[in-house]
C-alpha cells in the first residue's frame, strides 16, 4: 500500500499479499518492480500467466538492474526483491524502440525500401519479432551495424504468433491485409492474469 508523501518521501506500509488483475497490461507490475526495492523489508513478486507480456516485464527488470537494484529470480516469473535498496544514476546508450520502428519496417515491406538505424540486435525487446514476422509475410530484411533495411517483395499470407509482442499486432494486421492470400494473427489478446505480492 502506498501512502502520500511525508516530508518529501513516500511512506510505504507493508501488507501480507494482494492480487492485481493483469488483463489490461503490465503497468501495475512495472510500478511494483520500481517501488518494492525501496521498502524496509524483502518482497516476493509472482506473476501468474504472464502470457503476451513476458518481454515487457523482463525489460523493466533489466532497466532497474542497470540502476544498481538487485532482483533475484527464484523461479519462472517469481522474483525476490531485497528491501533497503537505493537507485543509482548511470550513463547509458538508449537503444531504438522496436515497437515504434515496426511502423517504418512495415512501410518498407509495403514498397518504400526503408532503413531504420540504432536498433540493436541484442535486446530483450519482444517487439523485435517484427523482423521475423515481416520475413514470414515475404518481405526482405537485411541487418548490419544496428541498421535494419526492409525491402518490399511479393507479400503473401502467413500465420503470425503474437505471443510476447502484442503491441505490434495492429500494424502487422494492416500489413497482412495488403498481402496476397489469408493471414492469421494468433495470441493477440492479453489473458486474465494475476500478480501475487508477498511481504514477510
Language-model segments: residues:
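Short, structured segments at the rim of ligand-binding sites
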Residues: 1-197
Amino acid at each position: 500500500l502506498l501512502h502520500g508523501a511525508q516530508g518529501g518521501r513516500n511512506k510505504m506500509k507493508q501488507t501480507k499479499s494482494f492480487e492485481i488483475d493483469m488483463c489490461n497490461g503490465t503497468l501495475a507490475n512495472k510500478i511494483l518492480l520500481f517501488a518494492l526495492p525501496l521498502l524496509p523489508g524483502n518482497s516476493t513478486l509472482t506473476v501468474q500467466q504472464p502470457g503476451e507480456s513476458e518481454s515487457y516485464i523482463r525489460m523493466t527488470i533489466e532497466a532497474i538492474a542497470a540502476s544498481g537494484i538487485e532482483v533475484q529470480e527464484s523461479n519462472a516469473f517469481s522474483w525476490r526483491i531485497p528491501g533497503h535498496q537505493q537507485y543509482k544514476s548511470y550513463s547509458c546508450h538508449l537503444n531504438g524502440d522496436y515497437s515504434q520502428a515496426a511502423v517504418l519496417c512495415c512501410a518498407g515491406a509495403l514498397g518504400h525500401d526503408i532503413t531504420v538505424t540504432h536498433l540493436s540486435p541484442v535486446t530483450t525487446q519482444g517487439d523485435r519479432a517484427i523482423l521475423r514476422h515481416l520475413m514470414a509475410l515475404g518481405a526482405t530484411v537485411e541487418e548490419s551495424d544496428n541498421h535494419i533495411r526492409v525491402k518490399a517483395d511479393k507479400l503473401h499470407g502467413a500465420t503470425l504468433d503474437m505471443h510476447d509482442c502484442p503491441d505490434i499486432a495492429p500494424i502487422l494486421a494492416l500489413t497482412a491485409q495488403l498481402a496476397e492470400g489469408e493471414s492469421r494473427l494468433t495470441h493477440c489478446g492479453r489473458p486474465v492474469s494475476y500478480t501475487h505480492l508477498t511481504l514477510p
